Amino acid sequence: MSVLETFDPAVAEVIRQETERQEYNLELIASENFVSPAVLEAQGSVLTNKYAEGYPGKRYYGGCHCVDVVENLAIDRAKELFGADHVNVQPHSGSQANMAVYFSVLKPGDTVLGMNLAHGGHLTHGSPVNFSGKLFNIVPYGVSKETQTIDYEETERLALEHKPKMIVVGASAYPRIIDFEAFRRIADKVGAVVMVDMAHIAGLVAAGLHPSPVPYAEFVTTTTHKTLRGPRGGMIMCREDWAKTLNSNIFPGIQGGPLMHVIAAKAVAFKEALTPEFKQYQGQIVKNAKALAEGLTKRGFKLTSGGTDNHLMLVDLSQTELTGKVAEEALDRAGITVNKNGIPFDTRSPFITSGIRIGTPAATSHGLKEAEMEQVAGFIAEVLGNVSDEAKLAAVKTQVNALMKRFPMYANRLV
């Protein structure tokens, strides 16, 4: 029995159940992934005990010589990985990373061009319910109704009309390559700063499978989980002339002490991302996404923009009797985890939606490849064709569990 099982069996049991869910269910949420045992070990280390306000060599606490080393490792590895001038690894999340950039560049009321959440953007890109939409004048851009890809001509028109101080680029539900160079050209016409939020595609960028935003943006933010396969957290890269301003807007601007155990886990993840095996893994994520997209398309499902270039796809259910909410719940009962998601120009509420978002990073971490993606497409079709038939959903769940048992990841933690 572990120390936790002895002292707090209730929490230990929840962890056991969640480990079992991650091990035997099929995780297809595009923003989720499974970290390596090395990352888990670093995050669960005694570094969680150490306060370290400030930056390496300039702390407000004593006894920081060890955590200084680990933070510098994370910074140096991130610089090598992405070719950035300056890196701050202290943000607790992607949202806080974005907030720090807003506060570095803008004053309340300044105009920002950001991707419409309903078209695939993110809450922090200007949603009215988020700090970004409450503090700044947001002008949303989006996708073309015909192609369902970013409308660069319309974005340029909006920029010329509204003269934003900053243009926010990036998405949380966009399956195509983003043209960062085009956004740079637009920004230069109006003297705007470019901030790219590459949270979803950071792993693909690191592996050279998506163009890098670093040459085109003053700031690049990302989470360190998702495709990057590190711990849950954030990171910011910027040009050297913004470094001092950025650092002061993280600490003491919006955060106090950094989470040193998480920064250690980030350092480990960045080392993993510098390996040839990581590049192969990212390539498999994209191959799996394309295989799954093809499998769904040939079974009659409509995908926004017609497919995918990256790790995710949006299944458009608007021409069916299903809603995203019903589809998500039915798939969950069959052991397949996705999330309901709005599609461009959706007429349903965000709590109901006309689509589901599907991604392949977590399944690829388990070891699934194209042949398994064909099976997965069949599972999804079977479930969505029988959302009210509990016997059929149970049968699919049995097949899902059998499939996942062939690709163990954390099974040793269930012993």
Curated annotation (Swiss-Prot):
Cellular component, GO annotation: cytosol
Subcellular compartments: Cytoplasm
Annotated pathway: One-carbon metabolism; tetrahydrofolate interconversion; Amino-acid biosynthesis; glycine biosynthesis; glycine from L-serine: step 1/1
E.C. numbers: 2.1.2.1
Segments crossing the lipid bilayer: none
Modified residues (N6-(pyridoxal phosphate)lysine): 226
GO biological process: glycine biosynthetic process from serine; tetrahydrofolate interconversion
GO MF term (any one): glycine hydroxymethyltransferase activity
Keyword Magnesium belongs to the record: no
Keyword set, alphabetical order: Amino-acid biosynthesis, Cytoplasm, One-carbon metabolism, Pyridoxal phosphate, Transferase
Cofactor(s) of this protein: pyridoxal 5'-phosphate
Site (Plays an important role in substrate specificity): 225
Binding site for (6S)-5,6,7,8-tetrahydrofolate: 117, 121-123, 349-351
InterPro entries in the cross-refs: PyrdxlP-dep_Trfase, PyrdxlP-dep_Trfase_major, PyrdxlP-dep_Trfase_small, Ser_HO-MeTrfase, Ser_HO-MeTrfase-like, Ser_HO-MeTrfase_PLP_BS, SHMT-like_dom
Major localization class: cytoplasm
Catalytic activity, reaction form: (6R)-5,10-methylene-5,6,7,8-tetrahydrofolate + glycine + H2O = (6S)-5,6,7,8-tetrahydrofolate + L-serine
PANTHER family: SERINE HYDROXYMETHYLTRANSFERASE (PTHR11680:SF50)
Function: Catalyzes the reversible interconversion of serine and glycine with tetrahydrofolate (THF) serving as the one-carbon carrier. This reaction serves as the major source of one-carbon groups required for the biosynthesis of purines, thymidylate, methionine, and other important biomolecules. Also exhibits THF-independent aldolase activity toward beta-hydroxyamino acids, producing glycine and aldehydes, via a retro-aldol mechanism.
HAMAP family to which the protein is assigned, alphabetical: SHMT
Family: Belongs to the SHMT family.
NCBIfam families given in the database record: PRK00011.1
Oligomeric form and interacting partners: Homodimer.
Protein name (record): Serine hydroxymethyltransferase
Organism of origin: Citrifermentans bemidjiense (strain ATCC BAA-1014 / DSM 16622 / JCM 12645 / Bem)
